[in-house]
Amino acid sequence: MSLSLGIVGLPNVGKSTLFNALTRNNVLAANYPFATIEPNEGVVPLPDARLARLAEMFGSERILAAPVTFVDIAGIVKGASEGAGLGNKFLANIRECDAICQVVRVFADDDVVHVDGKVDPRSDIEVIETELMIADMQTLEKAVPRLEKEARNNKDRKAVHEAAVAAQAVLDSGTTLFAAGSKVDSALLRELNLLTTKPFLYVFNADESVLGDDAKIAELRALVAPADAVFLDAKIESELQELDDESAAELLESIGQHERGLDSLARAGFHTLKLQTYLTAGPKEARAWTIHQGDTAPKAAGVIHTDFEKGFIKAEVVSFDDLTAAGSMAAAKAAGKVRIEGKDYVMHDGDVVEFRFNV
């Protein structure tokens, strides 16, 4: 399963520095607008300590973590919805992503010039949201008359037309369709590929003064709720990537952080996309597989191979916690912790699974 988060932000907020840290790529990170033109894509492993334990238990030769894909997209400016700057390319690249990850600058640095001349997180967020909302308004302005005509001739299209009209009202009120939640049935509007229906995740690129200020962090979280928010220092994250684990832990402790910001970001990305993982293990590999929350066992099996879904018979399932408590698969079976589940079983995060299928 390949789902991606598009990293967006105004110029000079630290997008490419963050992306470099995520992927250890040397993407051009220059102090001028549009240093990123073609989107750069990077795949980052989702940190999962459970895999090392499974590999130890099963004698696995290698560990394969679930991938999280990030796309670094050109910096946006006011007027992007009208094609200003690299607006048209920006909007096209965003449409191809499954979620929007906005980097917001909250660090002070006189050597890195903010495009608007001042650091104002609320304003930065509003600029990008406004451009995305305007683009959606333009899409709906063309679509609503067409959908109205279709609804007159085909009653099945009536619900789509009504959802589009509701979406217009939400956008006119200055709210993104993601923030509107259940007020708009976004599933009905999937054919329009509206930008603000995509889930939002905010990354506040902060310095030590902000990272150590609980009140400021709470204020910024409230600013973007109900979306998830991650707080990190992109420069520090870049430095951490060059250090061994012991030195990295010392650096994190010195700035009062308990874990790498990138680990928090990868998990938040998974949460934003409503994803989870199930686990498989054997002599060759211990592996995490990405599925949607709510997926059934056959659907999950299909992530490994489509034949597994088509010929699904049953799944042997044990929770990771029950397996590790037992100490081995044999002991877990003896303790009655391994279950046989059928096609209607809804998967849970951390299920350790072996599928039975016939093709």
What are these regions (language model features)?
Residues 1-84, 88-111:
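Conserved G1/Walker A P-loop phosphate-binding module
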Residues 2-8, 13, 19, 146-348, ...:
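C-terminal-of-GTPase-core extension/linker across diverse P-loop GTPases
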Residues 22-32, 39-41, 46-49, 53, ...:
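Residue-level signal for pocket-adjacent positions within structured domains
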Residues 24, 56, 92, 96, ...:
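Short, intrinsically disordered, mixed-charge
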Residues 34, 48-51, 64-70, 84-97, ...:
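Amphipathic alpha-helical transducer elements in NTP-driven molecular machines
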Residues 36, 86-87, 117-120, 218-221:
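Glycine-rich, phosphate-binding/catalytic loops in enzymes
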Residues 42-47, 74-84, 95-157, 170-183, ...:
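Conserved Switch II/interswitch segment of TRAFAC-class P-loop GTPases
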